[in-house]
Amino acid sequence: MEKIPLIVIAGLTATGKTDVAVELAQLVNGEIVSADSMCVYKLMDIGTAKPTKEQREAVRHHVIDVVFPDEDYNVAMFQKDATNAILDIYKRGKVPLLVGGTGFYIKSVVDDIEFPEMGDSKQVRKKLFDELNNKGNMYLYELLKEIDKDAANSVHPNNVKRVIRYLEIYFLTGKKPTEFLDKVRRKGSERYNVLPLCFIMEREALWQRIDQRVEKMFDMGLADEVKMLLDMGYSKDLKSMQGLGYKQVIPYVEGKISLQEAKEELKIRTRQFAKRQRIWFKYQGEFVFLDVTGMRFEEVVKKCFELCKSVV
């Protein structure tokens, strides 16, 4: 069976993945499949740093604006949507590019991970968020510790999103999160001929780009976007609204902190996110790391294009 060429552009936030991918897609006659867990949400454009209208007109994008902010979406659903998009792109004689910074989303496609069936998590998640609001994050963390010490030891108590995700797995499957995840089997990249690029950047340069991105987001109307979502009735406790770029801005919209405090909080959280990304990608092993520090945009595109010749 002929393998499908798949160009992966992964890496740290704010390293210019989207801009390079759009240019590269035009050079290789490709289309982009977004691998970003936040870009799947409709109405959430600025805080998710979605490709611009011009970029989406220049190159067709897939797996963007899939669900509304109060609808469920997870890695298994992404894998199905992304795989279907890749097959469709290839059948039409074009080259698929998988682009984004959500590592496990990328891995689910590239490694063709098999996910066990899970039930509807909406009601379970609502109950857990009610517990969070009424009893606090330490209550949930202690609950996780009782259920699965190994899972609890792998996550910080303040990482509420991850704690809740582990508890969801337990209440939906009846299994310890670590046991459940151990049964997620890797089948390997049998269907794809993959070029797995990963953009990295020196810390000081990346911090500067993150600061610039946050300032630009606020200039583009991030606070107005968050206010609009709240005014439309989307709860601040939703998984989507707890995402980076939204959770940090809600207190400002509610009048609890200043604009400058909101900006600083988002900058700090984005840096922390970039650190976690760096660690995750580093330990995957299969990526070709491309340090884009100080490189001009044209140089990055040219380098990627040269590397693409191995699969296209």
Curated annotation (Swiss-Prot):
PANTHER family assigned? TRNA DIMETHYLALLYLTRANSFERASE (PTHR11088:SF60)
Reading the lineage from the top rank, the first entry is Bacteria
Question: Would you tell me the protein name for this molecule?
Answer: tRNA dimethylallyltransferase
Which reaction(s) does the protein catalyse, per the Swiss-Prot or TrEMBL entry?
Answer: adenosine(37) in tRNA + dimethylallyl diphosphate = N(6)-dimethylallyladenosine(37) in tRNA + diphosphate
Family assignment? Belongs to the IPP transferase family.
The lineage, from the top, is: Bacteria, Bacillati, Bacillota, Bacillota incertae sedis, Caldicellulosiruptorales
Query: Which SUPFAM superfamilies does this chain map to?
Result: P-loop containing nucleoside triphosphate hydrolases
Primary role:
Catalyzes the transfer of a dimethylallyl group onto the adenine at position 37 in tRNAs that read codons beginning with uridine, leading to the formation of N6-(dimethylallyl)adenosine (i(6)A).
Tell me the NCBIfam families matching this sequence.
Answer: miaA (TIGR00174)
Its EC number is 2.5.1.75
Q: Which InterPro entries match?
A: Dimethylallyltransferase, IPT, P-loop_NTPase
Cofactor(s) listed: Mg(2+)
Residue ranges for the region (Interaction with substrate tRNA) are 36-39
Please tell me where substrate binds in this chain. Answer: 13-18
Q: Per UniProt, which keywords does this protein have?
A: ATP-binding, Magnesium, Nucleotide-binding, Transferase, tRNA processing
MF (Gene Ontology)? ATP binding; tRNA dimethylallyltransferase activity
Q: Which residues bind ATP?
A: 11-18
* Positions bearing the site annotation: Interaction with substrate tRNA: 102, 125
The biological process GO terms on file are:
tRNA modification
Oligomeric state and interaction partners are given as: Monomer.
